[in-house]
């Protein structure tokens, strides 16, 4: 039973049934309502009204209110705001009507209004300032002035102005000035945020805020990437993240192109691992390492060992950045010569780029239509950047006519941060070198330069171009003299040092000059191209804002990926370069040779340690006090046989002091494998077992590899330790170990027959071996040898054996034998025929009608892939066929280039199989390769030199050479197949078609040249010997047909043979008499002209020849069609109509023969005639003294 409430509750103090509303103070209720609206709660209309209130009062709304504003739907918001607009219009009409009634009353009311306005002006005087600009009134305001109407008293009455700009801040350097136009009654403002009702004025305000930086453009400058540096460098490049991706791509290509090696690497990796995880890891590591040793794999160690012959008095060194040479010679102390530092000082500033700018003092002058062109007076100031334009004007922005009005905006540009480029002068490069003697050194003093200098065991010196020679005193060890040839290895004209912020980089000159940033020169303060860091925003009726771009430092750092980082303060430390020195050792002497042997016991103070260079350092403690005495130390293979093996790096080690427990460091080089280090004599003898990993053959292989790298890297200063006058009895030994390439290291020197027989023997032994591990090892090694014996494999880079007249690129070989026969085992292939077909199609659409091959190997490549290309074109519905014609004469150049594309054509298996058996039909349009020039496909519409070597692969009978499309346009020949060398008195420039040989006999002169074909590219300077200050008119083989710009390409009495028989086949240039002819030197001889064959059209021999000032024996060309003489040698009294002349002119169209004085049949080698005869003498002095020039230009290590 329930009881109804009510009865008992009547007498309570508070009746729960009749409780009314709580009593709240009215102001508290209002506060609650307003606070809920500020928090974004409440009816939409109230929220919008509150936001409008904040907008009109220039107050900042709360975040919650803004959040509610953003959440309101568009249709709802538009409905309420439209009603607000109607209400505002009603209020405006009411005010206008009220104003007219008040004016009729007159009297004191007008005076009262004027006083009120004056009071407002006085109240605003502390914030607003008045001045003049462009002949009109200028008011300077701040952000507190825009909340109310600004009243300015004028002679015409009060001028009321309204400013509704949203970018008004506090005053600072970032100001903006523009016109507030006068609007007549009843016109609404249009495209203006400031207007007045009486007369136009200018407004100025600052745009700075307390909470954030100035407004800046979102745009950024596009800076082209720098790319990888071409310098051989010891340090990592900046942000070099692209190499990992490129290396993975190269690994993939290597696996595809060398499946045999990849299979063997996978088998070896699988055999090495004991579980599946290890097998996968080992296989991946082997596949990643393998291509590093098949392409671009040659590395440089930072320490070389040089052993001199007995009685040697001097030795040639090549010091590289951060490298160290250890020199050992009989009866001489061992020396360490170390390149400590390469430094360039007094850098000249070239150009400064601004990468962070600021924009201040913006002013805009506007004019109405038909009132003339706007002109901003600040245009006269060079520190301002101005821009003129046109805007829409009319009644809503102060103009009586509608139309385009002129506007002129100026802004002051100033640079906040700049990047400075500096150039290095070769004469300001200095080299700091240290020499250290392997003497008696304790572990405390090892590496302590000051202590070693105090003991006369070390010295430092600086080499500069002005002071290349120095003599160092080494105390009891005598003295050494160094004569150096400073060559930085850095082309200072091609690189700049660029400083960005706190970092400095070595950048390419062309990249630096092409930067799209404002720049200035050292002699000027004006910035050029300032518009690149400024943005003129869209112009309004009378206002145009200008903003600066943000700092471009991040973009510059990103673009500099691949550049070399250097340290720069007042000088720059270089990490690329080398120094060639001759070290004279005749005054060096061993110390302690007369000391007796130590008789007390030695102990190992520390366990012997591996230096990482194949040597071991032993720290010995001597208990005796009978010093000074020599240390009996030796390395032996067995304790039962004390025959010394290995050698001491520290020659004649001794204990220098008589104090007990003195410590001495000794360095020695043990043999590969197991050995014992024995110290002491008799029962006081101690020993330590040592194992040195590696092999003698592997060491020799790595040494040869290192020499080949120096040949490629140093160019005309390539050198060879085995070619310096018999000073060395062994080549320079790089002691860093070579991982990978083990098979070629052990068996690469054998013939393929020996490799095959040995492989078969090992396979047989593996099959018959009982032990599983031995059997697998024999089978794997035998299989590798059989594979090597049946495949030609290669590394990139070419080496020359001058004695055998042999050039080797990888393991493929290119031989120039004694009977002048060229034998090549190379085969050019495109990267993929599918992509090449698409490239051909794209080029044909762009107006390229064909190509000119650079060499005969490229021509053969086009012949080999022609049918496959045509099938691809046909399968993809392209009405185009590739036609390969036989080349005529030399391989000519053409102006256009093929361009790369990522697209490829597709072809099915059926079409591919059909292409092997049948050639496709000829299409209506053709793409012509080589052949004679025709009207349908002239040379000016052909492409040339569009491909370069990407990689070397393998093949059964030939080395495969893979080509890719060049990324840049160049006339240079491909350097991947070029080798240059100087050895003894012979210098050679060679590639797969040229063998140009020069000899030293009193002077260097061209001796002979053999041409497989004649091409039209230019020989690269990076592979040119002695190319300083060479005049092209003296080059016998013209520069335009790949003649090296070298002083080796000269001979006394002869000038450039631009009209030689270069269109002939099988050309051999040498200096001798053509069979059955004689040449005499006489002043009455004819003038220089095109080369003439010694037989006429009918085969009659011309026996008598002459020249004016040539040297004998004469220059001749031997070709398949007969013997020709050089341009200086002319026939004596012969019918001109029967002569066979060369029709070639190897100069390009803009050049003329500098020795020509008449028509082609009467061309003189003497421009001034007989009275001004030119004898053709050439200065052959190399500046290093007679026959030693060969050493100055480097040597070849094959």
UniProtKB/Swiss-Prot annotation:
> What does UniProt say on post-translational modification here?
Genome polyprotein: Specific enzymatic cleavages in vivo yield mature proteins. Cleavages in the lumen of endoplasmic reticulum are performed by host signal peptidase, whereas cleavages in the cytoplasmic side are performed by serine protease NS3. Signal cleavage at the 2K-4B site requires a prior NS3 protease-mediated cleavage at the 4A-2K site.
Q: Which GO terms describe its biological process?
A: clathrin-dependent endocytosis of virus by host cell; fusion of virus membrane with host endosome membrane; viral translational frameshifting; virion attachment to host cell
Q: Show the InterPro entries listed in the entry.
A: Env_glycoprot_M_flavivir, Env_glycoprot_M_sf_flavivir, Flav_gly_cen_dom_subdom1, Flavi_capsidC, Flavi_capsidC_sf, Flavi_E_Ig-like, Flavi_E_Stem/Anchor_dom, Flavi_E_Stem/Anchor_dom_sf
Answer yes or no on keyword Secreted.
yes
Membrane-spanning parts:
110-130, 254-274, 280-294, 747-767, 774-794
Q: Does the keyword Membrane apply?
A: yes
Give the start-end ranges of region Interaction with host EXOC1: 2-15
What GO annotations for molecular function exist for this entry? protein dimerization activity; structural molecule activity
Q: Where are the disulfide bridges? A: 297-324, 354-410, 354-415, 368-399, 386-410, 386-415, 484-581, 598-629, 798-809, 849-937, 973-1017, 1074-1123, 1085-1106, 1107-1110
Q: Which UniProt keywords apply?
A: Capsid protein, Clathrin-mediated endocytosis of virus by host, Cleavage on pair of basic residues, Disulfide bond, Fusion of virus membrane with host endosomal membrane, Fusion of virus membrane with host membrane, Glycoprotein, Host endoplasmic reticulum, Host membrane, Host-virus interaction, Membrane, Secreted, Transmembrane, Transmembrane helix, Viral attachment to host cell, Viral envelope protein, Viral penetration into host cytoplasm, Virion, Virus endocytosis by host, Virus entry into host cell
Region of interest (Fusion peptide), ranges: 392-405
| Propeptide residue span(s) | 106-127
Domain comment text? Answer: The transmembrane domains of the small envelope protein M and envelope protein E contain an endoplasmic reticulum retention signal.
State the protein's name: Structural polyprotein
